């Protein structure tokens, strides 16, 4: 009888250990660290259906932003990891020497002009520089342009974010956009 109780106790302990190990692995899968983010700039746009466009851009000599590559797009369903990976790719592309005209950018997005494209879309702007990434949620103006909600950077984090953390941060910031 005592052997049965001892055996059951050992079995319960083993099951408890296995369950805890599996739970810890699931927690850590969302926190896998990536290489630090590449210096660059992207604007992230989300429409009413949850479709996300990431537009890589760089600045000209007059400090005007211009798309530096074609937009990257992801449709629902997606995870924070998926969104973070797309933004990471956009940051890499922002360093390209390309410079897309507004016409080419609008054709790639499937719209005639910026005002039409921006209607109903929320936006977050990201700038990664010197191992920091700055986030700014925006307010859409009546002419279709966007302005930062706050002066300066709304949030600054170290550039050593996992795709999950990056995607999660952007999805939370986009909720603040108007």
What are the roles of these predicted feature ranges?
Residues 79-100, 166-176:
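Repeat-associated, polar segments at repeat-unit boundaries in modular proteins
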Residues 11-14, 103, 112, 129, ...:
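Low-complexity, intrinsically disordered/propeptide-like segments
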Residues 62-64, 93, 97, 101, ...:
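Generic marker of "main functional regions" within proteins
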Residues 25-36, 89, 93-127:
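Intrinsic disorder/low-complexity detector
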Residues 2-26:
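N-terminal signal-anchor transmembrane alpha helix of single-pass membrane proteins
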Residues 3, 126-130:
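Charged/polar interaction segments and conserved charged motifs
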């Amino acid at each position: 009888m005592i052997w049965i109780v001892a055996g059951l106790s050992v079995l319960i302990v083993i099951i408890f250990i296995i369950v805890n190990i599996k739970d810890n692995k699931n927690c850590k899968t969302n926190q896998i660290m990536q290489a630090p983010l590449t210096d660059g700039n992207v604007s992230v746009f989300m429409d009413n259906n949850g479709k996300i466009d990431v537009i890589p851009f760089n600045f000209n000599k007059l400090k005007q932003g211009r798309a530096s590559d074609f937009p990257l797009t992801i449709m629902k369903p997606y995870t924070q990891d998926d969104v973070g990976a797309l933004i990471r790719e956009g940051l890499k592309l922002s360093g390209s020497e390309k410079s897309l005209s507004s016409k080419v950018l609008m054709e790639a997005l499937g719209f005639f002009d910026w005002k039409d494209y921006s209607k109903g879309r929320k936006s977050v702007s990201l700038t990664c520089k010197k191992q920091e990434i700055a986030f700014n949620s925006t307010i859409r103006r009546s002419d279709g342009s966007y302005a930062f909600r706050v002066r300066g950077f709304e949030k600054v984090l170290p550039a050593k974010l996992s795709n999950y953390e990056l995607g999660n941060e952007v999805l939370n910031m986009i909720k603040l956009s108007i």
